[in-house]
Amino acid sequence: MTWYVLLLLLVAAERLAELATARRNAAWSLARGGREYGRSHYPAIVALHAALLAGCAAEAVYRPFLPALGWTALAVVAAAQGLRWWCVLSLGPRWNTRVIVVPGLPLVAAGPYRLLRHPNYAAVVLEGLALPLVHTAWVTALGFTLLNAVLLRVRIRCENSALTYARTADPLLGLVR
């Protein structure tokens, strides 16, 4: 269990690094005329991700470590982290935990964005399911996955609307390769 708590602390530290990156990138985007969308649902996303970590820690106390499940889930968590940071690196200063669109910038179609429309959310789904299962916290995995599906539905609609608005506001926008 101690190593699992250390894993959760590492994931929490990674989340803090994400928030620092997002804060810096938000300043970059807003300084270039960026507009934020979906501000009202952002606190629910932050709360859900905090609850994921707390739920993992609390439920793992009552669950055994099952090696076949745990090691497989840990590999999925590592893959999800890799995908997430590939997204961050591919978007550069345009990556954010918030939906901020800078008018006049073309859509990014490099890195994982050439394969998936929303690869960062794929990483979130994978991690939200796998991280609890590393230590058999299936109630947390199920609860997070269901609540996350509701939030992602709102979030993806918001992001798609924002990106559509940005494209139609400037019909000359192309794709970054």
Language-model features, listed with the residues they occupy:
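Feature marks short, highly hydrophobic, charge-poor N-terminal signal-anchor/signal peptide-like helices
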Residues: 1-6
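A generic secondary-structure signal marking the coil-to-beta-strand transition
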Residues: 9, 43-44, 50, 75, ...
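N-terminal signal-anchor/start-transfer transmembrane helix
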Residues: 8-23
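Cytosolic-biased juxtamembrane loops and peripheral soluble domains of multi-pass membrane proteins
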Residues: 22-40, 64-177
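Long, highly hydrophobic alpha-helical transmembrane signal-anchor segments
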Residues: 40-69
